[in-house]
Each structure stands twice: as C-alpha cells, then as structure tokens.
C-alpha cells in the first residue's frame, strides 16, 4: 500500500536483506528502525510490514477488539504456517496484513472481521500527515539515533 510505504520512508525506516541471519526469517524492529529479512524472494517482507502497520497505527495488534477478532477467526487460517501465524494476536495481525496486500478478496471472504480491522489500520496509516510524522520523530529520534549510529 502506498501510504504504508510512504510512512516507512517518511520515518526513515530501513529495509535490510541479510542472508546470514539465523533464528528468524524476518524481523521488524521499531527501536532498531528497520525490517530485516533473510530471503528477498519470500513474501516475508509483507508480514514484517504488517508489524510496522500495527505499531504505527497505535499498536492496534494489542487492542482488546483485535484480540476478540483473533480468538474468533484464527481457526479459519488454513495455510502451511498456521501454527506460527496463530500463536498470538501480533503474528496473526502481521500475517493478516500480508494477506490484505496479496490476497485481499480471499481475506475479505474467509475472515471478514480480520479484513475490516486491518483495512481500518491501513486507513489510519494512510491518513497520517506531516505533523504526525514530526510527532513520531520527536518521540523516537533519540532511540533511533542510538541504533542508527
């Protein structure tokens, strides 16, 4: 989504490809100011962007409403990494964002509450203004500068 990528850029986040990382396929780090992935050809980047969306939209993956949706619709996940994706509401949101980007109509029809919630989070990010980005910079630049140095 263009608004998500714009926010990623405006906040100065970095995308890092590192085939030598171990222990994970991808990782979003708000404090580290980056997304790291092990395989460029993998759709993992969308999952990690999902963590970014949840964070920038106000940690929406920690809200009670989201946890209720997670409890209600996680059993409808049928793909190969179901165990990982459904282990907690945060991973479920990140993967739901991936599905929102790559398989929107399928997500909408099979997990409609999930779809609506992710869509609302994306809309929040899309509506962010320069003032919102400036506010986030004021809040986080000290942390980001520590990690970026």
What are these regions (language model features)?
Residues 1-148:
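Active-site-flanking segments in enzyme catalytic domains
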